[in-house]
Amino acid sequence: MDLSVQVGSVALRGPVMTASGTAGHGDELAGYFDLSSIGAVVVKSLGADPWAGNPSPRVHQTPAGMLNSVGLQGRGVEYWRTEELPALLASGATVVASIWGRAVEDYARAAELLADLPEQVVAVEVNLSCPNLHHGSDLFAHDPQAVTEVLGVAAACGKPMWAKLSPNTERLVEVAGAAQAAGAEAVTLINTVMGMAIDVETRTPRLGAGRGGLSGPAIHPVAVRCVYDVHAAHPELPIVGVGGVAAPEHAVELMLAGASAVQVGTATFADPRNVARISSGMESWCRRQGVRRVSELTGGAHG
C-alpha cells in the first residue's frame, strides 16, 4: 500500500496533515501521536511581528463545528524559529510553515525571515484570507491582483508556496488560477466560511470581534464543492483539501473531488489523535477498496 503523495514538488509520506491554526506552532501534539507518522504538521500562521489577536471571547461552539475569531495571535516568525521549531524538528515531523500579513509588506518581511529554513520544512503556506488594510480591508484572497502581489514577495521564503484561499468569493476559480500563475505550487482549499452567532439573552454577538470563521463538519460540503470546481478548471494545479474532515471518508471525498492531500483541523479540538486516526483509517479504506496507491484517488469523481 503506497500512501505517498506529491503536492507540486513536495513529496509527502502520507496524504493527511494538520491544518494551520489547530495544532499550535510546534510539537504540541507530540504527546498524542508520532508526528512523523503523518504527511506534515502545518503550523499556525506566523506574522513578521508579534500580534495580540482579537478580543475575547474568541471561540463559540456551533451544532456542527465552531466559530472562531482568534485573530492570528502569535509571537512572530523569529520567536518560532528559535523557540518552537527546534522541538518540532526533533520530533521527526515534516513541517509546513504558514505566514500571514495585513499588507503586502508584512508578507514580504515574514517571508524574508523564513529564508534558509532546514530541509525538513518542505513548504510555506501563504494565508491569503486576511484583510488588506490598504484596500478597504477586503481579503487578499478575493482579489487576483492582490494574490499576485503577495505571492510575488512571499517567494523570498525560498520554499514551495501553497496559497490558502477563502471560499467567501465568487471568484475562487479565477483567484486559484492567479495564484498558480504567480508561482504557487498548490492551493489550499478552503479557509473558514464567514459566520456569526448572537446570544439571544444578552442580545450581543457571541464573539468579541462580532463575526468569525466557521469550521468543522458544517462546511465540509462547501470544501468539496470548492475543490471540485478548482480541479475542474485547473486540473494541473495541485490542491490541498481542508474543511470539515472528521472521518477517513471525508478525506477520501476531498481527494476524489481533486485534492492531492488533505488537512485535518477542527477535529483535533475534539481529540488531538484524530489526525493519526484519519490517516490510518484512510489506509484501511484503501485496502478494503483495493486501492494500491492513495494518489490514484485524486480527481476520481471527475470521470
Task: Report the location of each language-model feature.
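Conserved, mostly hydrophobic/aromatic
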Residues: T18, V41, W80, A97, ...
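N-terminal capping/small domains of soluble enzymes
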Residues: M1-V95, W100-G101
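Catalytic cores of alpha/beta
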Residues: D27-Y32, E105-L117, T169-A182, H231-E236, ...
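Short beta-strand/loop segments at the ligand-binding rim of alpha/beta enzyme cores
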Residues: A11-M17, S91-V96, A156-P167, A232-V242
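Alpha/beta catalytic cores of nucleotide-metabolism and tRNA/nucleoside-modifying enzymes
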Residues: I38, L214-P238, A246-G303
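Glycine-rich phosphate-binding active-site loops on the catalytic face of alpha/beta enzymes
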Residues: V43-A48, A123, L128-C130, A186-M196, ...
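Glycine/Thr-rich beta-alpha phosphate-binding loop at enzyme active sites
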Residues: M66, C130-Q145, V175-L237
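Glycine-rich beta-to-alpha transition loops that act as phosphate-gripper elements at the mouths
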Residues: A23, S98-G101, L165-R171, H220, ...
